[in-house]
Amino acid sequence: MSSSCWLLLSLVAVATAQSLIEEKAESFLNKFNQEAEDLSYQSSLASWNYNTNITEENAQKMNEAAAKWSAFYEEQSKIAQNFSLQEIQNATIKRQLKALQQSGSSALSPDKNKQLNTILNTMSTIYSTGKVCNSMNPQECFLLEPGLDEIMATSTDYNRRLWAWEGWRAEVGKQLRPLYEEYVVLKNEMARANNYEDYGDYWRGDYEAEGVEGYNYNRNQLIEDVENTFKEIKPLYEQLHAYVRTKLMEVYPSYISPTGCLPAHLLGDMWGRFWTNLYPLTTPFLQKPNIDVTDAMVNQSWDAERIFKEAEKFFVSVGLPQMTPGFWTNSMLTEPGDDRKVVCHPTAWDLGHGDFRIKMCTKVTMDNFLTAHHEMGHIQYDMAYAKQPFLLRNGANEGFHEAVGEIMSLSAATPKHLKSIGLLPSNFQEDNETEINFLLKQALTIVGTLPFTYMLEKWRWMVFQDKIPREQWTKKWWEMKREIVGVVEPLPHDETYCDPASLFHVSNDYSFIRYYTRTIYQFQFQEALCQAAKHDGPLHKCDISNSTEAGQKLLNMLSLGNSGPWTLALENVVGSRNMDVKPLLNYFQPLFVWLKEQNRNSTVGWSTDWSPYADQSIKVRISLKSALGKNAYEWTDNEMYLFRSSVAYAMREYFSREKNQTVPFGEADVWVSDLKPRVSFNFFVTSPKNVSDIIPRSEVEEAIRMSRGRINDIFGLNDNSLEFLGIYPTLKPPYEPPVTIWLIIFGVVMGTVVVGIVILIVTGIKGRKKKNETKREENPYDSMDIGKGESNAGFQNSDDAQTSF
């Protein structure tokens, strides 16, 4: 037999073997898909029941269902790992096997997996049920929704906002801190068991694209793309930041620096994530009709169902399907009125078996109107790829899923669309001023959130990479917040806080960079769909409603799910494989030009040195080694606790003696910032009754003077080694300048007199006697009998007059 025949037979044998392997893999996946859909549905349903009725019983049922799903998935993942991907040529089979070979949290031991689930459930419960109570009326308590969110959305009372902001972080963030520390350790262990460097790397793996030549994308490219696009966006953000700062100075004139960062609690919501609610305070042209149509919705008696029905009409108008009957039956579109505790944060659910739902405590506002479009966009994506195999039912990447609803929101927010549904009057006329009003409102929501999103995820990536030590998490959080976002903490926080976890997405284990990438994608999609809709004019005026051409182009992409690389899906819609920020910048170009003109006499950018509490802070310097030598002790958290307690004692004494008031100051009312290793720091004091009431620095100084000796004794130091800068030491007279004007005049007069006396008696008095006589003239205490000595009580050791602390 010739060599060519042997070669042909070999190729046939290889092809046959390969075909058998693929048939076996396909059979395995078909069986998996059927079983997975049933178990996944049961787990998702139990999770839905818990999120819409938070009880111990429902938590237990959710954990049991999740454990069954996890055990099944772990078993199937191990079987999938027996298939060599190199032997699989069918792209669809290969993609499913690769996904299944990633075992997720099942890679942990059963005990650690159970521990992780318990931590996640506990964090979710703390977040969803956390309350902030009024210290003056402990029965008056506020949930986040409804309650605190309303204060942060509408109040212009600086102190009330600060009370809500601090209360949420003190009550919820502090509880989450130890749990979040465990969460980071376990999630990193899980990620490394799945061959990722850390959990941040695991999240970025969602953006990997491979298998199709020219469309590859690795997870490290995501970091580069985010960094580069942020540099392009930053000039627009800086202009917006400067404009908002100027406007907030008009509302809070005593609390804003014209060159500094913005206080975090003044930015429209609990986190400063979206600045949408700042629009009433920052509207450029107030004489124009209000493009926030909340009042019109209320006046027309809109309710939650009307909001979602209107969103559905939008999707149907571009050729996408209606919601299923089960959607309207099973969704939770308003907060229950039966005292159930629920997770109000808006989310879209694809439970499986064609069961699609939305959970949202809808309010009749324009913001919620747009949120409804966003959440229904998720459902449209879910329905579009429902026919894909179970493992490919997902967005091309996580940012795509978030972008779909945002595309519709861009159109739904336009004055043109709002007029068409009767929320703006038919005689509403668009001009340059209404255009700027509209674009500013859009920018407060879209541009204002980008640095927030970028910075939060960068911080988490660094935490997962162990680049930020655990004992510096909060410190680094606020350093990055100041530097990147231009936002400052209104009160200093130590490492007992977990401010990042006070946001739903952090405490509930969501990747967050999706909200950054989605913003880039949504404008790329919008530009392409507007071209399909044959829109003529600026991008910000485009409304794609009623364009089935645009809808079909979008649907073609949605139906792919995760069956191919996202770079290919992006190219199919926009003609490019890469994230591109230019459509976003083009959308806001008229606003950018206007902002630069408005800010021509203002500082653009920010200094990171200023803080709202700086003026009332006192600086402390402590010199342990120079004072105690070999006996010097280390300045630890315990020493700082003792210092804060001693200041609280001084405040109690001061208010008791000087004001005849009993005020229960505690160490928690003494706030420390800018702690340096050598040791120095700043501190100020707030009222125990109201954290937003900062005690004037002058009163704190008086309290320190009154108890200075006691404080020194506590630490074994003195006025020179425990320095309160700006407070004169109390164990010696206050410092006075050596030369003053009155003393100069007095000296001239006395000098003339002395000269006359000297001339008269110079021949009879010796030089030394003359010198002593001159000193006597200048010494008001010369009459005292120094030999006896007189005790000055003001210079006695404080221990003689007071008991030790």
Swiss-Prot record:
Tissue: Expressed in heart, kidney and forebrain. In testis, expression is restricted to Leydig cells. In heart, expressed in endothelial cells from small and large arteries, arterial smooth muscle cells, and myocytes (at protein level). Ubiquitously expressed, with highest levels in ileum, bladder and lung.
Amino-acid positions noted as binding chloride in the UniProt annotation, renumbered to this chain: 169, 477, 481
Main location: membrane
UniProt region (Disordered), positions on chain: 771-805
Binding-site residues, Zn(2+): 374, 378, 402
Ranges annotated as spanning the membrane: 741-761
Cross-link Glycyl lysine isopeptide (Lys-Gly) (interchain with G-Cter in ubiquitin) residue location(s): 788
Residues carrying covalently attached carbohydrate according to the record: 53, 82, 90, 299, 432, 546, 601, 660, 690
Motif (PDZ-binding): 803-805
Gene Ontology annotations of biological process type: angiotensin maturation; angiotensin-mediated drinking behavior; entry receptor-mediated virion attachment to host cell; maternal process involved in female pregnancy; negative regulation of ERK1 and ERK2 cascade; negative regulation of smooth muscle cell proliferation; positive regulation of amino acid transport; positive regulation of cardiac muscle contraction
Group of enzyme by EC: hydrolase
PTM annotation (Phosphotyrosine): residues: 781
Entry keywords, A to Z: Carboxypeptidase, Cell membrane, Cell projection, Chloride, Cytoplasm, Disulfide bond, Glycoprotein, Hydrolase, Isopeptide bond, Membrane, Metal-binding, Metalloprotease, Phosphoprotein, Protease, Secreted, Signal, Transmembrane, Transmembrane helix, Ubl conjugation, Zinc
Modification sites for Phosphoserine: 783
Induction cue: Down-regulated in hypertensive animals. Up-regulated after myocardial infarction.
InterPro entries named among the record's database cross-references: Collectrin_dom, Peptidase_M2
Signal peptide (residue range): 1-17
Subunit annotation: Homodimer. Interacts with the catalytically active form of TMPRSS2. Interacts with SLC6A19; this interaction is essential for expression and function of SLC6A19 in intestine. Interacts with ITGA5:ITGB1. Probably interacts (via endocytic sorting signal motif) with AP2M1; the interaction is inhibited by phosphorylation of Tyr-781. Interacts (via PDZ-binding motif) with NHERF1 (via PDZ domains); the interaction may enhance ACE2 membrane residence.
Family membership noted in the UniProt record: Belongs to the peptidase M2 family.
Note: In contrast to its human and palm-civet orthologs, does not interact with SARS-CoV spike glycoprotein.
PANTHER family referenced in this protein's UniProt entry, alphabetically: ANGIOTENSIN-CONVERTING ENZYME (PTHR10514), ANGIOTENSIN-CONVERTING ENZYME 2 (PTHR10514:SF24)
Official protein name in the record: Angiotensin-converting enzyme 2
